[in-house]
Design a protein with these regions (language model features):
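Sec-dependent N-terminal signal peptides
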Residues: 6-17
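N-terminal secretory signal peptides that target proteins for export/translocation
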Residues: 1-3
């Protein structure tokens, strides 16, 4: 009797875990930065290579990494399965998701919008056009999502932002931005060109 209960319990545990979405921890090669970027990719438990899935790119905030979103949103796996979505969580370091004109190892606009999207579309069964891609993020990641979505409307069909700043210029000494853009006092034009609010005119109807 005890053996039957034990086997039944183990079978139950196996079934529960087999219904969880798959969480894939990988590294994606960036030719632009000549390094590998850690990423977490979450696929539905009923992932079918014959089907195609929309992809949501989740960008973390300052001080975060590829594990930030899976840690703060414990139900990402459940959502991936329920809504048949693939979630992609890259490590954006403290890059603000720009291509830094000063730091060749911080070219995250190119990485996210080109290299990572290409990797995901090549290795997973995705809806590989803008209608199948969305991007969103928190704080620095919210800024990055807007920055990338506005500048790459051919890649991302939808965007969201939670607490993402749209004008970085009032904060020249904060959050390592000057490591990416240089000192504000000497590089005002660069700062002007890298703030989201000055990209609005690029939005298409």
């Amino acid at each position: 009797m005890i053996m039957k209960k034990t086997l039944s319990f183990l079978l139950f545990i196996f079934c529960v875990f087999s219904l969880q979405a798959e969480t894939i921890k990988t590294k994606v090669k960036s030719d632009a930065m000549n390094k590998d970027i850690p990423c977490v990719i979450i696929t539905p438990t009923n992932y079918n290579p014959s089907a195609t899935y929309p992809v949501i790119y989740l960008l973390h905030g300052y001080g975060g990494n590829q594990n930030t979103w899976p840690n703060i949103k414990k139900d990402l796996s459940q959502t991936a399965t329920q809504d048949s979505i693939i979630f992609v969580c890259p490590n954006g370091e403290n890059s603000w998701y720009w291509d830094s004109p000063f730091n060749k190892e911080s070219q995250f606009e190119t990485f996210i919008s080109k290299e990572l999207v290409s990797y995901v579309d090549k290795n997973f069964s995705t809806r590989d056009d803008r209608t199948g891609r969305a991007i969103t993020g928190l704080s620095m990641g919210g800024h990055g999502a807007l920055w990338l979505a506005i500048r790459h409307q051919d890649i991302f069909g939808a965007a969201g932002s939670t607490s993402g700043g749209v004008d970085i210029r009032p904060f020249p000494d904060n959050w390592d931005m000057k490591k990416q853009l240089g000192e504000y006092i000497n590089n005002k034009e660069i700062w002007d060109n890298h703030t989201v609010i000055n990209q609005i005119n690029k939005l298409q109807d």
